[in-house]
Amino acid sequence: MYHSNFQGDQTILSELDISAFYWINTHFQSRIFLKFMQLISIKQNFLWPGIVCLVIFLWLKKMRGLALVLATAISVSISDFLGATLKELIARDRPCHVLSHVEGIANCSNSFSFPSNHAINSFTFATIITRAYKNFAFILYISALLIGYSRVYLGVHYPTDVLSGALCGALIGYMGYKYFYLKILGLFKNKFPTLTNHELVETKISNH
């Protein structure tokens, strides 16, 4: 049984959360898997593919693509701000700062732990994109899950940090689709008559 170096943390963290953290953090430890987890955990490594994905949507789908790019940018900005704000309000220390025998630590940030911004941002992105284009659901949600898993595997977040981030991100992504994407697309419909009926029909179908 592992014990925390921080005497007061047992009043904050449940035994289940700590046990789940150690199970994920200590299983499947290998040099190759560690490198893979570090690779997908670097923000730039999933930021640029996301940008490329949105640019492709913009190029192929014209107005729908532009509406999706704008709505996604707004939604992810909101999720990132919310995550950073909650970190400061809740002020939960990262496991790599307060627990002993933590494996795989690459960079233990001085920022707080709850929630995981990696999780909240990646699930916001995955949800708003897949609401508009359901064919991308599998790859985007698998990617988001791997990113969240990597944060626990690398010892910088508890499972509940990632789970809460994922739930918040999914909610923000859904709200972003409903209140930003569809509203922006409706605005384009009124402002730009070149928006085709085919695009609008696709949008209505994907919304049901």
Language-model-detected regions and their locations in the chain:
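Alpha-helical membrane-inserting segments
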Residues: 78, 82, 86, 90, ...
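Small-polar-interrupted transmembrane alpha-helices in polytopic inner-membrane proteins
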Residues: 73-87, 138-151
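Membrane-embedded catalytic cores of phosphoryl/pyrophosphoryl-handling enzymes
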Residues: 102-208
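Alpha-helical transmembrane segments
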Residues: 43-46, 69-72, 135-142
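Membrane-helix interface segments
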Residues: 32, 63-68, 132-139
